[in-house]
């Protein structure tokens, strides 16, 4: 029985890893042994940061809302509590967008919520 060699498969696997390592610095973009480590670590970072991105954006929205609300004499926690009491169901993403791009619309929401403090 003849020996089964894996030439084509190895070549395909190497090519796939080196394609993922394109743009890396040093030997990481052309040396398979180094590239496979860097690609695996890069994929770990990507997996972790897809989850962290949700956390980071929520924090950013809260900071923007807080800054805009303080101009109207409230703090973030009071504002969010008043929104809930007023029955206004707008998420933080939309509120932050209004605070940055539509000051008049955001001001009217703040006035409506002030009535329920």
Curated annotation (Swiss-Prot):
- Domain of life per record: Bacteria
SUPFAM superfamilies reported for this sequence = Ribosomal protein L20
Signal peptide span: none
One GO cellular component from the entry? ribonucleoprotein complex
Would you kindly state one Gene Ontology biological process term found in this protein's UniProt entry?
ribosomal large subunit assembly
Q: Does the keyword Translocase apply?
A: no
Q: Which UniProt keywords apply?
A: Ribonucleoprotein, Ribosomal protein, RNA-binding, rRNA-binding
What's a Gene Ontology MF term here?
A: structural constituent of ribosome
Which PANTHER family does its entry note? 39S RIBOSOMAL PROTEIN L20
Identify its protein family: Belongs to the bacterial ribosomal protein bL20 family.
NCBIfam families, per database record: rplT_bact
What function does this protein fulfil?
A: Binds directly to 23S ribosomal RNA and is necessary for the in vitro assembly process of the 50S ribosomal subunit. It is not involved in the protein synthesizing functions of that subunit.
Query: What name appears for this protein in its UniProt entry?
Result: Large ribosomal subunit protein bL20
Q: Which organism is it from?
A: Rickettsia prowazekii (strain Madrid E)
Q: What gene name does this entry carry?
A: rplT
